[in-house]
């Protein structure tokens, strides 16, 4: 990565590798990520940590996953463990990678795990997700050892105008990129 000239590197921490089924922190899991952060910094590469990239622990799934409020406290416990281990060296935190994908595709369209078709559950899992994200942000701010910069990573697409000199073509590309992609794929709720 250093030879390629990368200035930053985004990676995801695996919740099931950090928190065991019995709710205990796995020191070896955290050590792996701590070593990764050290190596990145040693090579002049800024670490960007993603806390959730669709890897719901099996034990959490069995408790109900994104349809049960238990996930709010469980995720906050995981976030606290990661932040306490890495925040002395990490500034950039992404709470969730592409929430529309794991929620809409997993719980409505059934094309991603857990392959559910629960259209009527949309308000419920959306609310639980938003509360979980809020708690994650609060947890990062509370336990971070240096001032954190926090955000979400959204799924999106980019459209290029057919003719960059034509304002109508530029506007059409913009609308497809932001109003359709960001509005439909990510839903204004996120």
Model-derived features with residue positions:
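Non-catalytic scaffold segments within catalytic domains of secreted glycoside hydrolases
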Residues: 2-7, 16-190
């Amino acid at each position: 990565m250093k030879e390629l000239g990368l200035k930053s590197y985004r990676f995801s921490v695996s919740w099931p590798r950090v928190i065991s089924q019995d709710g205990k922190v796995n020191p070896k899991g955290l050590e792996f990520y701590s070593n990764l952060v050290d190596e990145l910094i040693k090579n002049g590469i800024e670490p960007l940590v993603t806390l959730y990239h669709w890897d719901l622990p099996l034990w959490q799934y069995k408790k109900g996953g994104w349809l049960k409020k238990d996930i709010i406290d469980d995720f906050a416990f995981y976030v606290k463990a990661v932040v306490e281990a890495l925040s002395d060296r990490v500034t950039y935190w992404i709470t969730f990678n592409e929430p529309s994908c794991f929620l809409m595709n997993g719980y409505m369209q059934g094309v991603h795990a857990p392959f559910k078709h629960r259209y009527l559950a949309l308000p419920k899992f959306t609310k639980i997700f938003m509360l979980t994200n809020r708690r994650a942000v609060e947890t990062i701010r509370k336990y971070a050892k240096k001032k954190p910069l926090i955000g979400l990573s959204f799924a999106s697409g980019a459209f290029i105008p057919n003719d960059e000199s034509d304002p109508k073509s530029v506007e059409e590309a913009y609308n497809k990129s932001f109003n359709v992609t960001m509005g439909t794929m990510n839903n204004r709720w996120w």
